[in-house]
From Swiss-Prot:
The keyword Hydrolase applies. Residues 19-26 are annotated as: G1. Belongs to the TRAFAC class translation factor GTPase superfamily. Classic translation factor GTPase family. EF-Tu/EF-1A subfamily. It comes from Shewanella sediminis (strain HAW-EB3). GTP binds at residues 19-26, 81-85, 136-139. It catalyses: GTP + H2O = GDP + phosphate + H(+). The gene is tuf. GTP hydrolase that promotes the GTP-dependent binding of aminoacyl-tRNA to the A-site of ribosomes during protein biosynthesis. One of its GO terms (molecular function) is translation elongation factor activity. The lineage of its organism: Bacteria, Pseudomonadati, Pseudomonadota, Gammaproteobacteria, Alteromonadales. This is Elongation factor Tu. Residues 174-176 are annotated as: G5. Residues 136-139 are annotated as: G4. Mg(2+) binds at residue 26. Monomer. SUPFAM superfamilies: EF-Tu/eEF-1alpha/eIF2-gamma C-terminal domain (SSF50465), P-loop containing nucleoside triphosphate hydrolases (SSF52540), Translation proteins (SSF50447).
Length: 394
């Protein structure tokens, strides 16, 4: 069977379901797939297919995730759903599935539960920009006031973590009843789809962002100067443009005098492309792997930041023992390792393999970073954890 061509005529948006265990995330995922396919066409995935989440590896970490796709008239959505709480933690911290917005599922029979709070906190830490609430199992609650109470509670909880709790959409529905084809509950799924379309803005494409290229290699070409190579992470670099070399040492400015790809000279290098950039007047020894080439003023170097970390379990090939304050591993950013020290939150004495924890990291030399940057934690080249920059301190 021939592969379907990927249609690029609609904006592509990444979403996912989050929330407490057994509140109905996977059932909702199946219901969205079922109702939208029935309404707008496409291929339906049932509960069993979604629940049987395949294993993926991201930065050496095993994560179970289900990916489904669905369409509304105006957009194409890629949706992730994870079977277990640990999978969510890993998924969100590694950025294995970056979300432009999340659907928080709360069972109206229970109200917010511990993992509801934890997923909201994680969303805040890893930079999920928008949350829409789906109150599930509303068919099992007869008391209108109880539903109002749960909605208030969820809104307050979201506000506590700096999400606009008073303004974000809350849809009251029943994923199971919608899946069983009951029209009044199917309508709620369409209402949720409408909220996705209107509340989550169209994400900026990588190519529209400010130019940045993590440097992987540096060469000297006699008579022409210094060439740095790497994959353009976002934006476009054009010949003749000024760029900054950021990280590890003091920031310097230079000009791009050439772009080449597969030994051909080009006018520009774009997001996603591997290319070599020729730099005017830059010496071979002034540039090194681990620095980035960036649009002037678009990114700055920092040494201290707050982060959210997931520590690999022994089974995942991580540490066999906990670590304590004063732990000094390497932090792998983009293309290089930098040693750093950690500061644990008050009251946390040690961190066990398999835990996730918020910690402050101080690196021995600055790295170009902004909030949301992912990194790995390594000991002698072996990955022992994954993290994300939650807030820059210095």
């Amino acid at each position: 069977m021939a592969k379907e061509k990927f249609e690029r005529n609609k904006p592509h948006v990444n979403v996912g379901t989050i929330g407490h265990v057994d509140h109905g995330k996977t059932t909702l995922t199946a219901a969205i797939s079922s109702v939208l396919t029935k309404t707008y066409g496409g291929e339906v995935k049932d509960f069993a297919q979604i629940d049987n989440a395949p294993e993926e590896r991201e930065r050496g970490i095993t994560i179970n995730t289900s990916h489904i796709e669905y369409d509304t008239p105006s957009r194409h959505y890629a949706h992730v759903d994870c079977p277990g709480h640990a999978d969510y933690v890993k998924n969100m911290i590694t950025g294995a599935a970056q979300m432009d917005g999340a659907i928080l599922v709360v069972a109206s029979t229970d109200g917010p539960m511990p993992q509801t709070r934890e997923h909201i906190l994680l969303s805040r830490q890893v930079g999920v920009p928008f949350i829409i609430v789906f109150m599930n199992k509303c068919d099992m609650v007869d008391d209108e006031e109880l539903l109002e109470l749960v909605e208030m509670e969820v809104r307050e909880l979201l506000s506590e973590y700096d999400f606009p709790g008073d303004d974000l959409p809350v849809i009251q529905g029943s994923a199971l009843k919608a899946l069983e084809g009951e029209p009044e509950w199917e309508a709620k799924i369409l209402e949720l789809a409408e909220a996705l379309d209107t509340y989550i803005p169209e994400p900026e494409r990588a190519i529209d962002g400010a130019f940045i290229l993590p440097i992987e290699d540096v060469f000297s070409i006699s008579g022409r100067g210094t060439v740095v190579t790497g994959r353009v992470e976002r934006g476009i670099i054009k010949v003749g443009e000024e760029v900054e070399i950021v990280g590890i040492k003091d920031t310097t400015k230079t000009t791009c005098t050439g772009v080449e790809m597969f030994r051909k000279l080009l006018d520009e290098g774009r997001a996603g492309e591997n290319c070599g950039v020729l730099l005017r007047g830059t010496k071979r020894e002034d540039v090194e792997r681990g620095q980035v080439l960036a649009a002037p003023g678009s990114i700055t170097p920092h040494t201290t930041f707050k982060s959210e970390i997931y520590v690999l379990s022994k089974e995942e090939g991580g540490r066999h023992t906990p670590f304590f304050k004063g732990y000094r591993p390497q932090f792998y950013f983009r293309t290089t390792d930098v040693t750093g020290t950690i500061e644990l939150p008050e009251g946390v004495e040690m961190v066990m393999p398999g835990d996730n924890v918020a910690m402050t990291v101080t690196l021995i030399c600055p790295i170009a970073m902004d909030e949301g940057l992912r990194f790995a934690i390594r000991e002698g080249g072996r990955t022992v954890g994954a993290g994300v920059v939650a807030e820059i301190v210095a």
